[in-house]
Amino acid sequence: MADHFDLIVLGGGPGGYVAAIRAAQLNLKVALVERVHLGGICLNWGCIPTKSLLRSAEVYHEMQNAEAYGLTSFKPDFDLDKIIARSREVATRLASGVKTLLRKNKVEVISGVGQLTGNQQMLVETTEGEEKILEAKDIIIATGARARQLPNVHSDGKHIWTYHHALKPPAMPKKLLVIGSGAIGIEFASFYADFGAEVSIVEHAPQILPMEDAEVSAYVAKAFKKRGIRILTQSALQNLTPDDEGVTAEIAGADGKVTKERFSHAIVAIGVVANVENIGLDKLGIKLDRGFIAVDGFGRTNVDHVWAIGDVAGAPCLAHKASHQGVIAAEAIAGCDHVHPLNTQNIPGCTYARPQVASVGLTEEKARQQGYNVKIGNFPFIANGKAIAQGATDGFVKTVFDADSGALLGAHMVGAEVTEMIQGYTVARTLETTEAEIMETIFPHPTLSEAMHESVLAAYGRALHF
């Protein structure tokens, strides 16, 4: 006999659990099916524990440079086991918090593996080995994604790692190859370099952080090289052969020449693959687009009553995108008024390396490609009072405006705490704010955020402090 709900959510990551909570707030009877961890990859083996590791690296770096602030007799050392243990404690604490939130909102959590047997029915094999049939008016698929693997290369966790292995290393690698330079690759490169590993990054694209503005990418590359991180762009990994002592990498450089080099470890960070297998998509004829479930701006699939959100529904594969998509889908299912479709141009992206990177909207290059007559503002942190006081003068803020309408097309930041500031520009884009309105906004002094204001002023020849 089937258990009946208004909504079934398959997957308890940042998209799934948020969708479940929002639907429950709207008085829907909700079941959430999760096979492993509430909180998903982000909370357990992604965003959150990574930030804990990077915070340890940041503190270690600051201790090494304490004399610059008048502090003496510092000889810092680190305990990798304790660094890892702290990151796991943080993840466990937050996962417990998600469980509490779901219980508070009266969401029924079912531990097990779910498979759609109809557009309003799901078969669940629970972790206890039971089979349950669930029925609902609507189903949201939020099964997430997993690390993309290299062809014919197995990430065994010994010498070849995915992000999962890199979050819990048995020892600090001596010589590390990072394959891929998106946010994940860059963050791990930064972390391991801070603790003394010899790091090389190989990237097929002409620049690291390929999705970021070219000026930002170039700045990060320069900063990384200054830290001793080697960067090989326009290069391709031809082969990766593990043995008992490490790995041998064959890398084709920009000139086409293939070289062999030994590394103690390699991290594969070349993107993700959607978890679309074995959940019943074929039976229902649910369409895919380049391996991801095809959806509209509200998360609807081509099959009535079946929705998809988060990484399984395509790029950008970001936790905050998944959560917002979850809210949109839940409100659309509940019949709320004034539900707005997802605008992917207003989703900020953040990379928490040293230096940090944050952006929203169009890069200068993309804006020009789309035919905009652009105005560019650029303001360096070295001209910002708070940055000088903090000893954090690296980086800049770049803004891209439509010269004809004054619309903010994009914002791109590199430097200290920019991941905490990008939301200001995201709000501006969401509200369709013009350059005049931002210029008329009062920014507090002294703050790093004043550089955001000055960048806008600079776009119109009005910068006051540079």
From Swiss-Prot:
Q: Which residues form the active site?
A: H445 (proton acceptor)
Q: How is the cofactor bound?
A: Binds 1 FAD per subunit.
Q: Where in the cell is it found?
A: Cytoplasm
GO biological-process terms attached to the record: 2-oxoglutarate metabolic process
Spell out the subunit comment: Homodimer.
The positions annotated for binding FAD are: E34, R35, V36, H37, L38, G39, G40, I41, C42, K51, G114, D311, A319
Q: Which family does it belong to?
A: Belongs to the class-I pyridine nucleotide-disulfide oxidoreductase family.
What Gene Ontology cellular-component terms does the record carry? cytoplasm
Identify the PROSITE patterns for this entry: PYRIDINE_REDOX_1
UniProt-recorded Gene Ontology molecular function terms = dihydrolipoyl dehydrogenase (NADH) activity; flavin adenine dinucleotide binding
Cofactors needed by this protein, per the record, are:
FAD
Q: What is the top-level taxon of the source organism?
A: Bacteria
Principal localization reads cytoplasm
Disulphide bridges: C42-C47
Q: What does this protein do?
A: Lipoamide dehydrogenase is a component of the alpha-ketoacid dehydrogenase complexes.
Query: What's in the misc comment field?
Result: The active site is a redox-active disulfide bond.
Enzyme Commission number, as recorded: 1.8.1.4
Q: Which reaction does it catalyse?
A: N(6)-[(R)-dihydrolipoyl]-L-lysyl-[protein] + NAD(+) = N(6)-[(R)-lipoyl]-L-lysyl-[protein] + NADH + H(+)
| Organism from which the protein derives | Zymomonas mobilis subsp. mobilis (strain ATCC 31821 / ZM4 / CP4)
Indicate what this protein is called per its UniProt record: Dihydrolipoyl dehydrogenase
Alphabetically sorted, this entry's keywords are:
Cytoplasm, Disulfide bond, FAD, Flavoprotein, NAD, Oxidoreductase, Redox-active center
Binding-site residues, NAD(+): G180, S181, G182, A183, I184, E203, A269, I270, G271, V272
